[in-house]
Design a protein with these regions (language model features):
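Beta-sandwich strand segments
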Residues: 32-38, 70-76, 138-146, 198-199, ...
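A short tyrosine-centered beta-strand micro-motif
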Residues: 130, 211-222
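Short beta-strand elements
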Residues: 230-257
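C-terminal region of N-terminal signal peptides and the immediate post-cleavage residues
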Residues: 17-33
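Bacterial N-terminal signal peptides that target proteins for export
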Residues: 1-12
């Protein structure tokens, strides 16, 4: 082989090696796919009406927020010192290689705050929304009649949802939401796990003062403003139709989603 041809062959071999190396890197990047969470609200349960000492009528019920996605739902709160009342929030999105990227959530959207309401831990502002609407004779939703009193939510792996989902840990991974002295807080929901807020907990109610007897729809939505990244924003809600009677002293469940 002549010297020019040999040089050309060597160059082509080098180019091939380089291209193969590039191809491997591209494939490695493609293999590391992101695993987003998928937030859902489970069926509402344990409805009852509380007559408060101040005269309010409170419709109480139990909620459960669940993660049915391929990836964990993980939020990190942080503040510079303990004198700062609110924490900024970052969401971590993990991928199949075990690394992650961070998404900064604007403070104007939401934040974490500490609540000494018997829970004594950090909460995400407006992670869920409760509402009640009147139903007409055909079962169609009418105007909004009330919203939930609760504005902050802590969440961790405290009840199982579906441990047969791929990647679901068989034991709880997220177990707390920090203390009043925390400057960094990690809270989350693992794949296949859910967080339960019992009907009796602080602010777990909708005020129903003045509502006439009749049929209503109670709806609860997770991440109602779509601040957080997940696989599907269209399946975040659940509803239950109820009947109020006895001048707002009795509640009966009619049907649920």
């Amino acid at each position: 082989m002549s010297r020019p041809l040999a040089a050309l062959a060597a160059a082509l071999i080098g180019l091939t090696v380089t291209l193969v190396g590039l191809t491997v890197n591209v494939h490695d990047a493609e293999a590391a796919t992101e695993q987003l969470p998928d937030l859902r609200m489970r069926r509402l349960t344990n409805f009852y009406i509380q007559q408060a000492s101040n005269g309010d009528k409170r419709l109480r019920f139990t909620t459960r927020i669940a993660n049915a996605g391929p990836g964990r739902f993980e939020l990190h709160g942080y503040r510079p010192d303990t004198s700062t009342a609110r924490m900024n929030i970052r969401q971590r999105i993990y991928n199949t290689s075990g690394t992650y990227r961070r998404i900064e959530i604007p403070r104007s959207s939401t934040y974490m705050f500490f609540a000494g309401d018997g829970h004594n831990h950090w909460h995400v502002h407006k992670l869920q929304r409760f509402e009640i609407r009147r139903l007409d004779a055909n079962g169609n939703e009418g105007e909004l009649k009330g919203t939930g009193a609760k504005t902050g939510f802590c969440f961790w792996d405290n009840t199982t949802y579906n441990l047969s989902l791929p990647g679901a840990p068989q034991t709880a991974y997220y177990t707390s939401c920090g203390t009043s002295r925390s400057v960094n807080v990690k809270m989350g929901l693992s794949v296949g796990w859910s967080d339960k807020y019992s009907a009796s907990l602080a602010y777990q109610w909708i005020k129903i003062n003045g509502l006439q007897d009749g049929n209503y729809r109670v709806r609860v939505i997770a991440d109602p403003y779509n601040w957080f990244s997940e696989t599907n924003d269209a399946n975040n809600g659940t509803w239950t139709d109820i009947r109020l009677s006895g001048g707002g002293t009795k509640v009966t469940v009619i049907s649920s989603s």
